[in-house]
Regions:
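Charged catalytic cores and adjacent phosphate/nucleic-acid-binding surfaces used
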Residues: 32, 84-183
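Extended substrate/RNA-proximal surfaces in nucleic-acid metabolism proteins
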Residues: 1-106
Length: 183
C-alpha cells in the first residue's frame, strides 16, 4: 500500500496545485485498486472485515496525505456494502476512528458530514452524529456539509437539518474555505 500511496500522492498533489481550488475534500472510494461501487471489494469479506479494512486504509491515507481540507463522508463504505444491515458498529473500530480524528485535528483538517445518508439510506449523514459528537469531544472544530447532490434538484438537500444538529453538538459555525484557507 505504501508504494501505491506515494505514487498517487505525488500525482494528486500535482493536480491539486495546478488549479485554484478553494476547498478540497479527501475521500476514500477505492482500496487496492477496487472501487466500492462495483462490489468487488466486498467479495469474500464479512461486513466487519470490510469495515475494518476501510477504516484502517482511511487512517493510512489521512496520515500520508496533506493536500485536502476535510475528510469526506467517513461512512461511505456503507452505501455500497452488500450487507442487509447497512449500519456501521462504530464501537468495533472506535480506536481507529479516534486515531483518524486525532490525526485530522493535529493536521488542522476537518470532517465533512455528507447528507446523502438521509437520501440513500433514510437514516442520517455520513458519518453519523454520534461520530460527529466524538470528533467534537476530541476538540475537532473544522466541519463542513456536503450533499453528493450530482443533480441540481438535490443541491443543499438536508443541509439545514445537519446544521441544526451541529449547533446541538456545540459547533459555532460550519467551515467554509477560500483559496484553501478556512474563512
Amino acid at each position: 500500500m505504501e508504494e501505491i500511496l506515494n505514487v498517487n500522492q505525488e500525482e494528486i498533489e500535482k493536480l491539486i496545485q495546478s488549479y485554484p481550488f478553494d476547498f478540497v475534500i479527501g475521500s476514500i472510494h477505492v482500496i487496492h485498486h477496487t472501487e466500492f461501487y462495483y462490489g468487488e471489494f466486498f467479495k469474500g469479506k464479512t461486513k466487519e472485515q470490510a469495515h475494518r479494512e476501510f477504516f484502517e486504509e482511511t487512517l493510512k491515507c489521512v496520515k500520508a496525505f496533506d493536500c485536502f481540507n476535510v475528510l469526506g463522508h467517513l461512512d461511505y463504505i456503507v452505501r455500497y456494502g452488500p450487507y442487509e444491515d447497512k449500519t456501521v458498529d462504530h464501537q468495533k473500530y472506535q480506536d481507529i476512528i479516534d486515531e483518524i480524528f486525532k490525526t485530522l485535528i493535529q493536521k488542522g483538517k476537518g470532517i465533512e458530514v455528507n447528507t446523502s445518508g438521509y437520501r440513500d439510506l433514510k437514516t442520517c449523514g455520513f458519518p453519523n452524529f454520534e461520530q460527529v459528537q466524538r470528533y467534537y469531544d476530541l476538540e475537532g472544530r473544522i466541519i463542513t456539509i456536503g450533499t453528493d447532490s450530482h443533480t441540481s434538484e438535490r443541491v443543499g438537500e438536508n443541509c439545514l437539518n445537519v446544521a441544526k444538529k451541529y449547533q446541538e453538538i456545540g459547533f459555532d459555525d460550519v467551515s467554509t474555505f477560500t483559496q484553501r484557507k478556512r474563512d
